Design a protein with these regions (language model features):
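Conserved catalytic-core segments of large NTP-driven translation/proteostasis enzymes
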Residues: 1-111
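C-terminal effector modules of nucleic-acid-centric enzymes and ribosome-associated factors
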Residues: 62-66, 79-313
Length: 313
């Protein structure tokens, strides 16, 4: 069942080898965590805007027409060079992966540390087959004792293609006397979050649901973290490590139970608490006769018809 879930998600392959095979061309290898790929498919190389067609593939040294994750795979890419697809790049199905400079994550400090992790500090994050310098902030605003876990926000020095659910390790940065020492390990919860206020209980609750909640709870939590801008179907699929059909079912359940609100066309989803915050000023504007803002009108009126015509929030 779990393998089926992985296979139904977008294909993603962090490249750990890239080389030229005489008579074949450029070959890349890696461990694909999710998705399916077949000969003839076009894959997006992240970071960047290059795309290459899969000319051939092998699994366990055997040629095949298609591959289903998880597992090791080698891909023969048409018209690509090793410079086009270097080690550290990520190959992904079109539109399924984000390049980001900020992520929310669950983090556990290793038990052997002499000192706790600071509330804010520079670190090196190793994720996929690459690494990046980052500023790490404890969202509690407090230090993290050795062996303890917390939610953090990582501000990356350069954009990386990162998926929800990815695991990573953290090492001390060049600015730290313990340079290169492994200090923590973690899991990405949100690959493209907003900045958060430190010590915000609503953020902590949503991240807790993303980390260990059921599928329905995780979708509700991701909608809540979108705040007033809301989130659409494509963004939910990019942010969550869940198959699209699971997200669709969770949205229907959340809407039916009043845990999620929907506005606009194409639809965007908001948390009920966010809608409540918007309703008060919207009603004031309506009472003043300010009906020129359809999104505000839709929120205030709570009308399916008005909501369908509303500009997305």
């Amino acid at each position: 069942h779990q393998r089926d879930r992985y296979a139904k998600m977008g294909f993603r392959l962090p490249v750990d080898r890239s080389f030229v095979l005489p008579g074949r061309g450029t070959i890349v290898t890696g461990t694909a965590a999710t998705g399916r790929v077949a000969i003839g498919d076009s894959l997006h190389v992240h970071p960047g805007d290059r795309r290459f067609r899969v000319r051939g593939l092998e699994r366990h040294g055997e040629a095949a027409d298609s591959f289903e994750a998880p597992g090791r795979v080698a891909l023969d890419l048409a018209a690509a060079s090793t410079d086009d697809v270097p080690v550290g790049a990520v190959l992904a199905a079109e539109g399924t992966l984000l390049e980001t400079v900020r992520v929310d994550a669950w983090l556990r400090a290793l038990p052997h540390l002499v000192r706790p992790l600071k509330a804010r500090q520079r670190v090196t994050v190793h994720i996929g087959t690459t690494h990046v310098e980052a500023a790490m902030t404890q969202l509690s605003g407090e230090v993290l004792p050795r062996g303890e876990a917390a939610f953090v926000q990582l501000h990356l020095d350069r954009p990386l293609a990162i998926a929800g659910g990815e695991r990573f390790i953290v090492r001390s940065s060049a600015a730290d006397p313990r340079f290169g020492q492994t200090i923590a390990g973690g899991q990405v919860l949100h690959p493209a979050p907003a900045r958060h206020k430190l010590g915000d209980p609503a953020v902590a609750q949503a991240l807790g649901q993303l980390f260990e909640g059921e599928d329905d709870d995780r979708v509700v939590a991701m909608v809540a973290l979108a705040r007033g801008r809301g989130v659409d179907d494509a963004e939910l699929a990019q942010h969550l490590d869940l198959p699209v059909d699971v997200i669709t079912r969770a949205l229907k359940t959340g809407l039916a139970r009043g845990r999620i609100r929907r506005f606009g066309r194409p639809p965007r989803y908001l948390a009920p608490a966010v809608v409540d915050e918007l309703e008060a000023p919207a009603w004031i504007e309506l009472e003043k006769g300010q009906l020129g803002k359809p999104a505000i009108a839709a929120v205030a009126l709570g009308s399916e018809g008005a909501a369908a015509r509303a500009t997305p929030l």
